[in-house]
Amino acid sequence: MKPSVILYKALPDDLLQRLQEHFTVHQVANLSPQTVEQNAAIFAEAEGLLGSNENVDAALLEKMPKLHATSTISVGYDNFDVDALTARKILLMHTPTVLTETVADTLMALVLSTARRVVEVAERVKAGEWTASIGPDWYGTDVHHKTLGIVGMGRIGMALAQRAHFGFNMPILYNARRHHKEAEERFNARYCDLDTLLQESDFVCLILPLTDETHHLFGAEQFAKMKSSAIFINAGRGPVVDENALIAALQKGEIHAAGLDVFEQEPLSVDSPLLSMANVVAVPHIGSATHETRYGMAACAVDNLIDALQGKVEKNCVNPHVAD
């Protein structure tokens, strides 16, 4: 008899078929308490769990006594109670490598669109404001040869540095938990403390996961240290930034503009002051949102669950020690 797994996000037909070759697959709409209660017998028997954008906490795990592995279609896993999973010896699999290049593309797009005011001036054209040769009130700022500060030099940070260094001749500053020799050798990146990075960078790109240590890492104090001409980019996790402090910094002119792919609360409220600011480019968490990459992430998550339930945790496992 095949192991039972619960799928809480739709998959392309071929990936669903691959999953069904290995498991008895039960599809549910979400992991809400109501859904769990309505499908209590299925949850009680499930050995695997696959999906994204739902919280997996201790309360849910209590309803799943046979769960051995959960696989998320994402690189981030801040919506999982890792301690609770680990205490129950449940493997947590994720997709850390598939989306690197695509998210770096999104970051570079935010850099360019904020600096050159692409969204703002495109809307002015659509509104019929282009009635003569444009003047300084339509101008943006250069990207090439400007200093890029990267906070978080992981895979995505490296991919962004590659684009900035080779494509735009940008000097690279970075702050991370440790020195990154490859970044320094390939891109002539310079390691510095966070205060120095904030004071010297023309663009500050935040690419950090959400942890207890990074929650509200960026607040009023950090924005006050940035150049008034600086542009702030966040494509990591929204709660790493105190959004009210960011709004205040933009309103007071402490920073020039912001390009944001993530927010403290998602979806972003239609009443957010960010949406009324012409110098803010706000997009709906599209970092990895291309057809190719989302398919690749789903395929990786399927393979991860198959591997995990077969005892193979050599890669893409957040807590591999539970398999020991």
Curated annotation (Swiss-Prot):
SUPFAM superfamilies from the UniProt entry: Formate/glycerate dehydrogenase catalytic domain-like, NAD(P)-binding Rossmann-fold domains
UniProtKB keywords: Cytoplasm, NAD, NADP, Oxidoreductase
Cellular component aspect of the GO annotation: cytosol; plasma membrane
Localization of this protein: Cytoplasm
Record's protein name: Glyoxylate/hydroxypyruvate reductase B
Top class in the EC scheme: oxidoreductase
Primary localization: cytoplasm
PROSITE patterns: D_2_HYDROXYACID_DH_2 (PS00670), D_2_HYDROXYACID_DH_3 (PS00671)
Catalytic site: R237, E266, H285 (proton donor)
InterPro entries cross-referenced by the UniProt entry: D-isomer_2-hydroxyacid_DH, D-isomer_2_OHA_DH_cat_dom, D-isomer_DH_CS, D-isomer_DH_NAD-bd, Glyo/OHPyrv_Rdtase_B, NAD(P)-bd_dom_sf
NCBIfam families hit by this protein: PRK15409.1 (NF011938)
Reaction(s) catalysed (UniProt annotation): glycolate + NADP(+) = glyoxylate + NADPH + H(+); (R)-glycerate + NAD(+) = 3-hydroxypyruvate + NADH + H(+); (R)-glycerate + NADP(+) = 3-hydroxypyruvate + NADPH + H(+)
UniProt EC number: 1.1.1.79, 1.1.1.81
UniProt keyword annotation of Cell membrane present: no
Complexes and interactors: Homodimer.
Pfam families xref list: 2-Hacid_dh (PF00389), 2-Hacid_dh_C (PF02826)
GO molecular function: glyoxylate reductase (NADPH) activity; hydroxypyruvate reductase (NADH) activity; hydroxypyruvate reductase (NADPH) activity; NAD binding
Task performed by this protein: Catalyzes the NADPH-dependent reduction of glyoxylate and hydroxypyruvate into glycolate and glycerate, respectively.
Similarity field: Belongs to the D-isomer specific 2-hydroxyacid dehydrogenase family. GhrB subfamily.
Organism: Shigella sonnei (strain Ss046)
Superkingdom per UniProt: Bacteria
